[in-house]
UniProtKB/Swiss-Prot annotation:
One Gene Ontology cellular component annotation held by this UniProt entry: cytosolic large ribosomal subunit
Protein known as: Large ribosomal subunit protein bL28
Family, per entry: Belongs to the bacterial ribosomal protein bL28 family.
Domain of life of the source: Bacteria
Biological classification of the source: Bacteria, Pseudomonadati, Pseudomonadota, Betaproteobacteria, Burkholderiales
Organism name: Delftia acidovorans (strain DSM 14801 / SPH-1)
Length: 77
């Protein structure tokens, strides 16, 4: 399964590990993804999403109904 946030679309980024001697090797910066269940009152059921910590804050701010409506408008839910 891809390491992608279902709400924000955050994906792994690519960068460098830099040693004290300034040697560089490739590395990946992974998003902080968590599986979370959200109770959707309007549908009277739980919805399980794989979301980043930034998406959790977005859901707290806008509400799960608003976020799900946005996902459905994009055709992802």
């Amino acid at each position: 399964m891809a390491r992608v946030c279902e709400v924000t679309g955050k994906k792994p980024m690519v960068g460098n590990n830099v040693s004290h001697a300034n040697n560089k090797t490739k590395r990946r910066f992974l998003p902080n993804l968590q599986y979370r269940r959200f109770w959707v009152e309007s549908e009277n059921r739980w919805v399980r999403l794989r979301v980043s910590s930034a998406a959790l804050r977005l859901i707290d701010k806008n509400g799960i109904d608003s976020v799900l409506a946005d996902l459905r408008a994009r055709g992802q839910a």
